[in-house]
Regions:
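Fe(II)/2-oxoglutarate oxygenase catalytic core
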Residues: 2-246, 250-278
Length: 278
């Protein structure tokens, strides 16, 4: 075993991993230990990591193929690294609503590795929600109802042309013509690696249940969002330069708080491809 330390966070999920330098090539045994921790907890954090873009990519590629984000600005010279930025003169941040990344894709992303490059003096935290717990704390009747349901996820209303979000973020978000895809996924999934059941909808990209109208879907989606985001189901992470959050998109939501007017927040994000959900 390695000498890494794994400390739980104060919230409903996630651990901080210490005594590891991700700028170095990880041994197979150390990587296996980190991977097992990630699968078990669904959310891992690192501190004080001085990573170049190449270091960031080297770590990410240990986990699988890299998704090239078609909407976000890229780090110069690195198409596989998305830039998540909010400058002092900008009002709207990226990711400022509960969501999980790429649920609008036919094969959603496995995970996202976010590295803090510049953080505000105060604020800019990220909230995470535990989708295992969201499922487990539903009533038996609700579980039975949702087990056979599927939902439609879309990027059109967020990244598409003439949407308020895309227009307000035009310097950071592009290619609205690519926001044409929808995807149908089960509402309850079995995680392909942990084998635990999780609720798989989110308020940003899930638009309706299959066979239901938007109007019929909204009350149930709203209820599930309220249920999921109860305080006892969430974790809050405070960033500093060199912090990394790596979340499993199949069992988490996240929400970037926009509470730092007049300051810069700059992150580099790499997204790892996943597999079909069932």
């Amino acid at each position: 075993m390695s000498n890494i330390l794994i400390n739980p966070t104060s919230g409903s999920m996630g651990v901080e991993i210490h005594n590891v330098d991700l700028s170095n090539e990880l041994s197979d045994s150390l990587f296996s230990e980190i991977r097992e921790t990630f699968i078990e907890h669904g959310l891992i954090f690192f501190r004080d990591q001085e990573l170049t873009p190449d270091d960031h990519l080297s770590f990410a590629k240990r986990w699988g193929e890299i998704n090239i984000n078609r909407f976000f600005a890229k780090v110069e010279g690195y198409d596989q690294i998305a830039e998540v930025r909010k400058d002092p003169d900008q009002k709207i941040n990226i990711g400022g609503a509960w969501h999980t990344d790429h649920s609008y894709d036919q094969i959603p992303a496995m995970g996202s590795i976010l590295l803090a490059k510049e953080t505000p003096k105060i604020g800019g935290d990220t909230l995470f929600a535990n989708m295992y717990k969201a499922y487990e704390t539903l009533s038996n009747g609700m579980k039975k109802t949702l087990e056979t349901m599927k939902a439609c996820h879309s990027s059109r209303h967020v990244f598409g042309a003439h949407t308020g979000y895309a227009e307000a973020s035009s310097q950071r978000i592009s290619n609205p013509e690519l926001a044409t895809q929808d995807a149908i996924h089960p509402v309850i999934i079995t995680h392909p690696e942990s084998k635990r059941k999780a609720l798989y909808i989110n308020p940003e990209f899930t638009v309706n249940f299959e066979g239901w109208t938007l109007e019929e879907s909204k009350p149930l989606l709203d209820y599930l969002t309220e249920h999921t985001t109860q305080q006892e189901n969430t974790t809050r992470f405070q960033w500093e330069p060199g912090s990394i959050a790596f979340w499993d998109n199949r069992c988490t939501w996240h929400f970037a708080l926009n509470d730092y007017p007049g300051e810069t927040r700059l992150m580099h994000r790499i997204t790892v491809e996943g597999s079909a959900l069932s």
